[in-house]
């Protein structure tokens, strides 16, 4: 990998504070671009708009989803913009390249009874249930990203006005409240689970060795919980974020509030969560339409 590409990734890590998962995606996008350059005997310094169009065709030939292609093009556009700030790249060959239209999809989420089943599973785990419950509670009760979760320190938790302070994308800080269930789980965890592991750091969540838990560790915990929960087959941290947003909106929270809680810059990003379940649609219809119910 070229030095300028390494410098770009370092900037994303240090200045933008991107998560490990996001950094890996950017790294892989650049590596795939480098493979194309080598195959086509092209020079990074002499890459032009026509070459960018050819690269777009190359990506489509790999049968990638439009969302994946769009992200890879965004990575390279951003990389060249960074390069130009270093007074090395003269032009950005991707600046005029039209983004492929993204596929529209409804975010997957859990129903409330599925969430209760997950909580029942961790409640019955005597060994590590207290820790796993806090992970579930924080992800579901606050909608935070897994990258934000693993960086929470004990001093970021406020038990007086229950909530947590997190550092989001771009180093932006926000405070998210949580309820009594989450508060009680946190108190039990801090009182009886974490002290037994003799942790010599102030990160909130730990693995079974007492070290700060990683994003991979959180995913492992969630997958383990799902394996032991009847009727639930798939889970990932972002699905809990989707669930938080969906349940908040279905219960009447306004879009701007949810945007603020999620840490979204654009309201349109939050807007995709305005899908509702069929049960919610029927509930609203029955309560709102004058001819939905027949008087006896």
Curated annotation (Swiss-Prot):
Pfam families membership: Phage_int_SAM_1, Phage_integrase
Gene3D superfamilies in alphabetical order: 1.10.150.130, Intergrase catalytic core (1.10.443.10)
InterPro entries registered for this protein in UniProt: CB (IPR044068), DNA_brk_join_enz (IPR011010), Integrase-like_cat_sf (IPR013762), Integrase_catalytic (IPR002104), Integrase_recombinase_N (IPR010998), Integrase_SAM-like_N (IPR004107), Recomb_XerC (IPR011931), Tyrosine_recombinase_XerC/XerD (IPR023009)
Ranges for domain Tyr recombinase: 105-286
Active site: 145, 169, 238, 241, 264, 273
Main location: cytoplasm
Keyword annotations of the record: Cell cycle, Cell division, Chromosome partition, Cytoplasm, DNA integration, DNA recombination, DNA-binding
Purpose: Site-specific tyrosine recombinase, which acts by catalyzing the cutting and rejoining of the recombining DNA molecules. The XerC-XerD complex is essential to convert dimers of the bacterial chromosome into monomers to permit their segregation at cell division. It also contributes to the segregational stability of plasmids.
Family indicated by similarity: Belongs to the 'phage' integrase family. XerC subfamily.
Subunit relationships: Forms a cyclic heterotetrameric complex composed of two molecules of XerC and two molecules of XerD.
UniProt name for this protein: Tyrosine recombinase XerC
């Amino acid at each position: 990998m070229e030095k300028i590409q390494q410098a770009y990734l370092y900037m994303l890590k240090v200045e933008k504070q991107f998560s490990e998962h996001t950094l890996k995606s950017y790294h892989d996008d650049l590596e795939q671009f480098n493979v194309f350059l080598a195959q086509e005997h092209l020079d990074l310094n002499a890459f032009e708009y026509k070459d960018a169009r050819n690269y777009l065709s190359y990506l489509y030939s790999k049968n990638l989803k439009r969302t994946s292609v769009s992200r890879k093009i965004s990575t390279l556009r951003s990389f060249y913009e960074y390069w130009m700030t270093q007074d090395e790249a003269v032009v950005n060959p991707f600046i005029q390249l039209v983004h492929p239209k993204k596929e529209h999809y409804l975010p997957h989420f859990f129903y409330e009874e599925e969430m209760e089943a997950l909580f029942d599973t961790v409640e019955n785990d005597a060994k590590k249930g207290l820790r796993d419950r806090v992970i579930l509670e924080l992800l579901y009760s606050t909608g935070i990203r897994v990258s934000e979760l693993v960086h929470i320190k004990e001093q970021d938790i406020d038990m007086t006005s229950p909530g947590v302070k997190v550092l989001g994308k771009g180093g932006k800080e926000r405070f998210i409240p949580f309820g009594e269930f989450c508060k009680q789980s946190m108190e039990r965890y801090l009182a009886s689970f974490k002290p037994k592991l003799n942790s010599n750091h102030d990160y909130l969540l730990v693995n079974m060795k007492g070290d700060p838990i990683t994003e991979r560790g959180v995913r492992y915990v969630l997958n383990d919980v799902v394996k032991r929960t009847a009727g639930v087959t798939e889970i990932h941290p972002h699905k809990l974020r989707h669930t938080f947003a969906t349940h908040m909106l279905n219960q009447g929270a306004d879009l701007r509030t949810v945007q603020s809680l999620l840490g979204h810059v654009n309201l349109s990003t939050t807007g995709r969560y305005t899908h509702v379940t069929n049960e919610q649609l029927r509930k609203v219809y029955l309560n709102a339409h004058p001819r939905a119910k027949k008087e006896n």
